[in-house]
Amino acid sequence: GSRGIGLAIAKRAAKDGANVILAAKTAEPHPKLPGTIYTAADEIEAEGGQALPVICDIRDEDRVKEAVDQGVERFGGIDICVNNASAIQLTGTLQTDMKRFDLMHQINTRGTYLVSKMCLPHLLKSENPHILNLSPPLDMHPKWFGPHVAYTMAKFGMSLCVLGMAEEFKEQGVAVNALWPRTAIATAAIKNALGGEEVMHLS
């Protein structure tokens, strides 16, 4: 949420007066990517919302719980959970090392599941609860798998969370949806990802 699509969503919500819990793995600036959770918090508050920047590695269950608890204590509850964190490497099977494979699945699939799970007890108390995942349609066409099967598997895991949780919590009134750009967006994260230059030409 400190840059790119996540920050854009947070700023748009802030225009409507939203309070935003902004979680990122580190407060240090990325050598290739602009912004930190603190600069993002300033931008959110400039739009009219309130921001709580929290350092949180979403692979760490205890830290996720602490971040959620801090947000609830500060703002009184949670109405919307946006799962935007994502690790990306657009490489084929032989070019993808297992450390990167594990990272993509830990952040994209497991992280989305964990953050949603920790937010749900609070969402169930909300009058109009939503979970929004930045993940693609479950399109089984081979063209989405061939060039970067490991990344697609990890992103589809996020989409399966949408499908499953929407069904599981529909009677309790929790709306669970996915948002996915129709075309690739030329963000700094895409540009700097291994294999991202080819995608940039399509955006």
Regions found by a protein language model. Name each.
Residues 92-93, 97-102:
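Substrate-binding pocket helix/loop in short-chain dehydrogenase/reductase
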Residues 1-75, 88-89:
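Short-chain dehydrogenase/reductase
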Residues 79-80, 102, 129-134, 174-177:
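Conserved catalytic-site loops of classical short-chain dehydrogenases/reductases
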Residues 16, 74-75, 91-92, 118-127, ...:
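A short helix-coil junction within the Rossmann-fold of NAD(P)-dependent oxidoreductases
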